[in-house]
C-alpha cells in the first residue's frame, strides 16, 4: 500500500455461519485496517465505506488502527464512515448525484471528509453526523428496500390466491399520493442487500 493523506476502506462484509446463527464476517475490515495501519501517519483520515453493523468504525476499525500504530484518534489521525450508495451499472452517475452521509469522529474529520467527497458529489448534498448514525442509516436504507421488495412479492402471492391481477392492484394503490409499491420480482438479491449485517 502506498502512503496517502486519506485511506478509503471498502471491502465485503459477508455473513459467516456460527452454530446455526448468522454473524457478520468483519475479517476483511480487520485485514484492511491492519494494512492501513502500516502506512498511517499523523494527520491522515481513514474512511470506512463498507456496509457494517453499528459501532464497527469505532470498535473494530479504529481499535485496530490505535493498537497497531500507537497513534490516537482525533489527536494523531481521524476516522469516518461514509457508506456507499450506488447501484451497479450506474456507479459514476450515482457517485456524482447521490447525497452522501458521512459519520465522523470529530469536526476536523468532518471537514476533511467533506472536502474530499465534495470533489466527487457534485450534484448531491453531503450530511455530516457521527459514525454510528451513518452506519445505522445505511442498514435502515437497505432494510427499507428489503421490506418494500417483500411486500410486493407477498401481494403477488395474495392476488394469485384471489385470482386477481397484482399489477392492477399495485397500479391503483400507487395512485395514492403516499403509496409507492414496487413491482413483484425475484426477491432481494445482488451483492449488497442480500448480505447486510
Where is each model-derived feature located?
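Structural/interface elements that position substrates and couple domains in central-metabolism enzymes
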Residues: 1-197
Amino acid at each position: 500500500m502506498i502512503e496517502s493523506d486519506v485511506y478509503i476502506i471498502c471491502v465485503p462484509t459477508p455473513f459467516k455461519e456460527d452454530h446455526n446463527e448468522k454473524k457478520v464476517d468483519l475479517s476483511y475490515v480487520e485485514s484492511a485496517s491492519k494494512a492501513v495501519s502500516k502506512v498511517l501517519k499523523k494527520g491522515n483520515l481513514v474512511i470506512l465505506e463498507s456496509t457494517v453493523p453499528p459501532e464497527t468504525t469505532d470498535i473494530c476499525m479504529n481499535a485496530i488502527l490505535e493498537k497497531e500504530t500507537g497513534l490516537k484518534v482525533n489527536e494523531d489521525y481521524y476516522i469516518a464512515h461514509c457508506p456507499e450508495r450506488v447501484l451497479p451499472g450506474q456507479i459514476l452517475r450515482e457517485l456524482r448525484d447521490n447525497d452522501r452521509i458521512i459519520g465522523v469522529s470529530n469536526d476536523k474529520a468532518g471537514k476533511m471528509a467533506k472536502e474530499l467527497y465534495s470533489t466527487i458529489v457534485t450534484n448531491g448534498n453531503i450530511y455530516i453526523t457521527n459514525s454510528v448514525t451513518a452506519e445505522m442509516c445505511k442498514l435502515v436504507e437497505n432494510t427499507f428496500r428489503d421490506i418494500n421488495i417483500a411486500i410486493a412479492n407477498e401481494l403477488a402471492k395474495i392476488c394469485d390466491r384471489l385470482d386477481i391481477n397484482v399489477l392492477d392492484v399495485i397500479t391503483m394503490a400507487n395512485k395514492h399520493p403516499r403509496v409507492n409499491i414496487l413491482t413483484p420480482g425475484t426477491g432481494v438479491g445482488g451483492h449488497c442487500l442480500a448480505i447486510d449485517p
